[in-house]
From Swiss-Prot:
It catalyses: 4 Fe(2+) + O2 + 4 H(+) = 4 Fe(3+) + 2 H2O. It is found in: Secreted; Cytoplasm. Fe cation 1 binds at E57, E92, H95. Fe cation 2 binds at E92, E140, Q175. GO terms for biological process: intracellular iron ion homeostasis; iron ion transport. Residues 1-27 form the signal peptide. This is Ferritin heavy chain. It comes from Aedes aegypti (Yellowfever mosquito). GO terms for cellular component: cytoplasm; extracellular space.
Amino acid sequence: MMKSVFFGVVAITVAILSIYQETAQAQEQTVGATDNYQWDSVDDQCLAALHRQINKEFDASIIYLKYAAYFAQEKINLPGFEKFFFHSAAEEREHGIKLIEYALMRGKAPVDKHFKLNYDHEVPTVTTGESALETALQKEVEVTKSIRGVIKACEDGSNDFHLADYLTGEYLDEQHKGQRELAEKIATLKKMKKSAPKLGEFLFDKNHM
């Protein structure tokens, strides 16, 4: 399973970098044609922030894949947590792909030369569901702050209200709902572990994930 997760992430990386190279070449070839028709105009600061956000979405997906693989191990066997984190990983990957599609729709390369996936986050050899959910909540808060940063960069730099509105409507609402859901899960799990220290996590995995 770990191999399939790894190769899946590698495939995403290769595909994204390939898109970047092809789009960059196409932009170089058509630069003369776009000098007089700025349909693809996006402020540099705004575009750089969008590139960073795309990177963050895929980074979050990798972290959630690692936790999903951890809980899927036969010696851990918490299928509720496994399903939750695989679903979360898929959502973050979808977010990244949607931003790639948006950048392409605006006539821009979806990633720049600084694009690099972060594999450094290590899941401890022994971890708990509570710890994993708290890590996920921290990551979602980080992603939300980053989205707000993109919105600010695009509004302040060139009044790019289309991108700002897209991020506000498509992303921020889902981010805030996701953070609330994670906070509720953490609170419920803590209560169950307090009332049943040995069975709390098992019952939570079965009934609340």
